[in-house]
């Protein structure tokens, strides 16, 4: 019997021979991970057995490269994968860990447990806590804060984080809150903004997280930026980058000249509405930007000849300037989600 497919999608993988990062179509099975050069390929480029393997996340071996996790096999071979964003990494890590645990216990992988899970008081689910903190109504309020002639947008103070943890009854006291906030920082759920919080993370303070009104932090993917006399680390972002990120992930994009298809990481922002696309293997600057205000986005079932397209899950964006972009999602559900999100963003802001 074929092993069950648990999860699949695009991840960026580090080459085992050369120090190159390339997007791959990755499939998590009950007993291993297969990776393909393209989603349409029939045979995988490689397979990683999960029995006896260990998983490290977050993996911080590569400096500025975020959302990386590492799988080490029983033969001490390291395999590095990079997700497009934090929640995507966490979803892969959660399923891989569960698959490894199921192999060890001789069990079949199942998403829903038939037994009621008993949550111990001292056990904190950082992923769930992060989502609660980001809740627009009940979560931590993102502010524009000023310090040292700089304006930090979409951020909050260290003491606000501890205040929220205590008032939300996630922790019993501020000392326990400091421990949880440090864990959130170490796992990448919070990012330091400004010299004070960055110095604490770099080890010049006793605790990596500071319960302090002058220590600033932000959520990854929040649209954080710093204005005015900014340092090299706090880049002044253009107007088009100021919108809040509402969706991101990898899609196939057709080139305008050669008409070939390549995997690109897309980040969708609203107000102003822009869809930026990047080389998923690591470039920080976008390859291009699609201004979505007044655009039309539709699913594509047939090509210009009227015949049914051989490519599945296609959709097209036509900008107000009548530039056409053809994109391909991995599944019908993913295509629908992208179309709805782009349509919603195109009606907001500038």
From Swiss-Prot:
Pfam families: DEP, PH. GO terms for molecular function: phosphatidylinositol-3,4-bisphosphate binding; protein homodimerization activity; protein kinase C binding. SMART domains: DEP, PH. Keywords: Acetylation, Phosphoprotein, Repeat. Signal peptide: none annotated. Residues 4-101, 244-347 form the PH domain. The modification Phosphoserine is found at residues 113, 117. The modification N6-acetyllysine is found at residue 64. Residues 136-221 form the DEP domain. GO terms for biological process: actin cytoskeleton organization; cell projection organization; cortical actin cytoskeleton organization; hematopoietic progenitor cell differentiation; integrin-mediated signaling pathway; intracellular signal transduction; negative regulation of calcium-mediated signaling; negative regulation of G protein-coupled receptor signaling pathway. GO terms for cellular component: cytoplasm; cytosol; extracellular region; membrane; plasma membrane; ruffle membrane. PROSITE patterns: DEP (PS50186), PH_DOMAIN (PS50003). Major protein kinase C substrate of platelets. This is Pleckstrin.
């Amino acid at each position: 019997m074929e092993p069950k497919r648990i999860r699949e999608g695009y991840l960026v993988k580090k080459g085992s021979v050369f120090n190159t990062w390339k997007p791959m179509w990755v499939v998590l099975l009950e007993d291993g991970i297969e990776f393909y050069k393209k989603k349409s390929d029939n045979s995988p480029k490689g397979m990683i057995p999960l029995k006896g393997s260990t998983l490290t996340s977050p993996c911080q071996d590569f400096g500025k490269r975020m959302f990386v996790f590492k799988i080490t096999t029983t033969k001490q071979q390291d395999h590095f994968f990079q997700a497009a964003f934090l929640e995507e990494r966490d979803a892969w890590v959660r399923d891989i860990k569960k698959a490894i645990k199921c192999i060890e216990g001789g069990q079949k992988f199942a998403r829903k447990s038939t037994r009621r899970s008993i949550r111990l008081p001292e056990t904190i689910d950082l992923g769930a806590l992060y989502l609660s903190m980001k809740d627009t109504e009940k979560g931590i309020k993102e502010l524009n804060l000023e310090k040292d002639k700089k304006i930090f947008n979409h951020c909050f103070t260290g003491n606000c984080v501890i205040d929220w943890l205590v008032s939300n009854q996630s922790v019993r006291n501020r000392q326990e809150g400091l421990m949880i906030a440090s864990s959130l920082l170490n796992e990448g759920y919070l990012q330091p903004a400004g010299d004070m919080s960055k110095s604490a993370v770099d080890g010049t303070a006793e605790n990596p997280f500071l319960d302090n009104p002058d220590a600033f932090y932000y959520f990854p993917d929040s649209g954080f930026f710093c204005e005015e006399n900014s340092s090299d680390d706090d880049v002044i972002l253009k107007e088009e980058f100021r919108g809040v990120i509402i969706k991101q992930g990898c899609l196939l994009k057709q080139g305008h000249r050669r008409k070939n298809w390549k995997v690109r990481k897309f980040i969708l922002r609203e107000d102003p509405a822009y869809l930026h696309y990047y080389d998923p293997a690591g470039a920080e600057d976008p390859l291009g930007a699609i201004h979505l205000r007044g655009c039309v986005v539709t699913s594509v079932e047939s090509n210009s000849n009227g015949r049914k397209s051989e490519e599945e899950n296609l959709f097209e964006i036509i900008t107000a300037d009548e530039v056409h972009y053809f994109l391909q999602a991995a599944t019908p559900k993913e295509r629908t989600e992208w179309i709805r999100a782009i349509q919603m963003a195109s009606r907001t802001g500038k």
